[in-house]
Structure formats: C-alpha cells, structure tokens
C-alpha cells in the first residue's frame, strides 16, 4: 500500500477529506464519529466532552480537548515535557547532521529545515525526538519548555502518510512532506518544534498564525523576534486535524533524554521525556 503513495493525488485527497471533516451533518456525522471511535478504540472518557453530540463535525471531534487532570505537566524545573500523545518513532543523538527516520533510513537537518545550512548548523550533533500521532490520538501540540517564539518557516512539500509502515519505506519522508518549523528561544538555548503534515491531515495550525497555508512563493519565513510571543511549558501551541508527526531538535550538549523513553514506546503530553543541561554563563 505504501508504494501507491507516490501515485495518489495526495493534496486533492487531503482537500476532499478536509472539506468533508468540516461538514455538519447531524445524525450522519454522529454515526460516522461512532464508527471511527469503535474502529480505533478511542477512550472518550478521557475527552473533556465525552458525549458524541457535543461534536458537530469531524474536525471538532479530531481536535477535542482532554480532561486536564488526566494530563498533568511534569513539574521538575529542568524537565522537558512531551509535546503530544503518541508513539515515539525515533529519538537520540543527531550524528553530524543525520537523523534516523527508521532502520536503514536517514535524512539531514539541512533538508528538514528547508535547505538552510546556517539554520541547520545550530543543531549539528544535537538531539532529536520524533513522535507519531495516530488517528486515535489527541491531536493538540504543547510546549516542551518555556520559550519565546522567534521564527516559523513553512516549507511546502508532499503529503505522504506518516504511519509506521510509510516511515519504514519512504526515503527522507519527513524532509519531503509539508511542514512548519517553529523555532523557540529558551533559557537553555534554541529549540525547534517541527509540525509535519501528512496525507488526509486537514491542515497544520498554530495558535499565533492559525491555519498554515502554502504560498505560491514556496518557503515562507515568518519572523516573530519583535512580537514577544511567549509560552509556558505545557501550553498549547498548535494542532493537527487528523494525526501526523512532531519532531523536536535541540543543540549539542543541551539535554539528556529520559532513559524510560524508548523508540516504539507510547507517551502522553506533559510526561517527562528528558532534562535540560544548565548552560554556564561566563
């Protein structure tokens, strides 16, 4: 099935599904949502509003909130909070500028960040964390550390599926799919939070920009250095309208991963995935 991706009209299919997901068809919508819940085994008791009737459209259902008490954000001062609910695809050290996508599949920071060597150089030999949000998961994205938004780079691209089978077979998938690279300044240095689009994902959305739409000019760079947009650890920064992938990047020698976090393991947003290394100021 994954070999068919290159032949499918990815963007057209995604637009059709996105349009359907906005339709408010009453009982028909509720019936479809119930089928989806049953198929994916979704626990609606975790939702802030468990009643299916609360959701007039699939988009409202996809972007449902969870009960806050079920996702406490780690309180340790130096802890890095998981930005999402999902499965850890890969994590670890960046080898030079190479990241692991899956066994025998690698891609580069330069390609991931829009072929900008100067931007990529800040993460050489750093650390990365890749999480996959399945269709059944909570689809909102949260801040791993306190930080100030300095830049967002929207990079148009393909819309391959990012499910585990595709990640293991499509070369350089994350560096080819549409994505929004969000750069934050933290007390521990630079941090990148990358929202990767995928087939059938309605859109990438951030709280400061809204829906991120491709432009005719290609790569779009949004500078927020003068805007003073700040987020606390655990605060929402964006969402997907289906399910996709989030990648974190950190500079060299600035963090240590939680040894309890391993590839293929499940995570919930707010959980401790690592700690920052204090930077000494001369």
Swiss-Prot record:
The modification Pyruvic acid (Ser) is found at residue 244. It is found in: Cell membrane. One of its GO terms (biological process) is phosphatidylethanolamine biosynthetic process. Disulfide bonds: none annotated. Catalyzes the formation of phosphatidylethanolamine (PtdEtn) from phosphatidylserine (PtdSer). Belongs to the phosphatidylserine decarboxylase family. PSD-B subfamily. Prokaryotic type I sub-subfamily. This is Phosphatidylserine decarboxylase proenzyme.
